[in-house]
Amino acid sequence: MLCDRAIAKALGEGVERFAPGARVGVPWLGGSCGQCWYCRHERENLCDAARYTGYQINGGFAEYTVADATYCFELPPRYEDLQAAPLLCAGLIGYRAYRLVESAERIGLYGFGAAAHILAQVARHRGQQIYAFT
């Protein structure tokens, strides 16, 4: 498995969203309790029981991994692996924040790491003014 992209070799019981051979994105967040305040408010990454690929869950650069289908998604064929890889970590983290301001004319980015770099490109493409604070 390279850069959080996998080819589904086998599916667990009840998994119907993917077919064997599907090219699947496996993001860093790989599981959470689903019951706490954070999980109930779409902030699973802050859950005390959150599990992460490459930390508690083998993956990232492993040859094989087991991933919870809840957190995975099929990758469109138009994206090559190198194009999709940044979107599976920094892109997902940044997009969660961007959804809160996506209709704003101007947005501020505090810090300028990988997530902000990706979001600046999205915002610029959408004609938004960007203010970065580093």
Regions found by a protein language model. Name each.
Residues G21-A22, C39-H41, V122-H125:
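Short, glycine/charged-enriched secondary-structure capping and boundary segments
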Residues W28, T53-I57, A67, A85-C89, ...:
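Short, well-structured alpha-helical patches and their helix-loop capping segments
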Residues M1-W37, P76-Y79:
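Glycine-rich beta-strand-centered segment in the early N-terminal region that forms part
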Residues L29-F73, P77:
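Cysteine-cluster motifs in flexible loop/terminal segments that predominantly coordinate metals
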Residues P77-T134:
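Mid-domain Rossmann-like dinucleotide-binding core that forms the NAD(H)/NADP(H) cofactor-binding site
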